[in-house]
Amino acid sequence: MFKSMAIAAFSLSSLLVAPLASANWQVNNEQSKVSFVSIKKNSIAEAHHFKKLSGGLNEQGQLKLMIDLTSVETLIPIRNERMTKLLFETHEFPNAILTADLSKTLATLKSGQHVLKGLKAELDFHGNKKELTIDVLANMSPKGDVTVSSLTPVIINASDFKVTEGISELQKLAGLPSIATAVPVTFSLTLDKEK
């Protein structure tokens, strides 16, 4: 479906929003969502999502999102089971972990203000890590909660994470002529400011 990056030094202008530096935020699972689309038979697209997300954003602007792969929801129980066992292999890789440096975003984010960034991130999925560049929309509510959403889908290629064999297994079991190995992923995260 994220090589640690050095924390960017705040510019002089970031001192104007220095109070943010003392905050921590936690992912609100109920108000957050990570979704992906699978395409079978070349043209049949189906949307799926994960029901359990956790993680947070610390005062240095480092984001960590943990996706519980056992919580995949495709609306078909047998497909959920096959994905967890054959594709994700959750007995060995129960989570996908996305890390990103939001320090520059936090430095310029004010209450109610939206900031678009080409965010550098790293996805750790199925024992493999890959750097990603994500376009995001960020917002801070008047009470200090932060939302971070994908502006465009993030394309995850199965070959980058060595899950093409799992896709082939799913294809055989379902009797399908094809399942796409490039998957668009979208996300919307709400991070509650700690009291």
Task: Locate the predicted segments by residue.
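Bacterial N-terminal signal peptides that target proteins for export
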Residues: M1-A9
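Low-complexity, acidic/polar, glycine-enriched regions of mature
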Residues: S22-K195
